[in-house]
């Protein structure tokens, strides 16, 4: 047996449903994918429910499941994981939130929840960090930019709770909501008040920021309000290396995925030019993967763009991006010391523009892997594969067994 390392390649949102503009095929079926098809033909395939049949997975719960951390035990909300991914060191008990920079008009209505898909908000985040003062509540905070319009907020202090609503109206043309406690608990009441004060102060800071004044002069949407959601209290995770006896790394543009990786103890490996969209640096990601395998036993590589195209309902763009992914994966064929597993984390069908419970295709290729009769990697072909239908909670244990890292159950 020569394989002693694991590549977990997650094609985010790869699964789909029949699309009219693709003659009833899914984008993955319609795409020309000689590399993925070769990996499928040289390995074993199947389909996978990352949480369970009929359950629509979030990107957060699905990645926890794929890494062997049952979300029913470990998931406390998306916010703290996003905050970790944005570079905020989240300690046990801190309250984390996802955040968006958005555009609010003079009437107080949100007109663009992504602030014109603004690219770099670090100056805005720095101003908020320097000028917002929550000391009257006995609370400190961290606020950090993510990719594009995304950001994260973390609160620290005594007597805080995660039981609060969002100010995000979830649609344009509506004013931001007040953050409300979801219970009568004093901790939730306090956190709601802190959040509303943070939003009030940050909105005033953004209104007068030179970067926003310049955007208005250039005809661009200003980032004039922060929308927060996904509150959660940071939990504890058994370190990945201690849990599985493997040194691990994560390569991803999505701050959620890097946050999950860092939370469980994977080393975050940055890559220049990654965007989390269909414009990302695919070649750089795969080259970085190859280099990281020289120093780590396990690498999680997440490629996000297909998910974005699915949410936008752009089946042809999704197909074309899948073909670009496939071309970039040619380097993987050179590695014989690895078990290569390719999978989705969930389906994002273009017809519904949202996550669905449709199972995702999975393939495993490497030394010692049984080879089935499947010759293509897509949702339909893989359903006939030798893995049959598995759960996300199963996949890492299957991979660990293939590199002889599991133990006999019983005698």
Swiss-Prot record:
It catalyses: (2R)-2-phosphoglycerate = (2R)-3-phosphoglycerate. Pathway: Carbohydrate degradation; glycolysis; pyruvate from D-glyceraldehyde 3-phosphate: step 3/5. Pfam families: Metalloenzyme (PF01676), PhosphMutase (PF10143). One of its GO terms (molecular function) is metal ion binding. One of its GO terms (biological process) is glycolytic process. Its EC number is 5.4.2.12. Keywords: Glycolysis, Isomerase. It is an enzyme of class 5 (isomerase). It comes from the Archaea. NCBIfam families: apgM (TIGR00306), PRK04024.1 (NF003104). Catalyzes the interconversion of 2-phosphoglycerate and 3-phosphoglycerate. Belongs to the BPG-independent phosphoglycerate mutase family. A-PGAM subfamily. PANTHER family: COFACTOR-INDEPENDENT PHOSPHOGLYCERATE MUTASE, METALLOENZYME DOMAIN-CONTAINING PROTEIN. This is 2,3-bisphosphoglycerate-independent phosphoglycerate mutase.
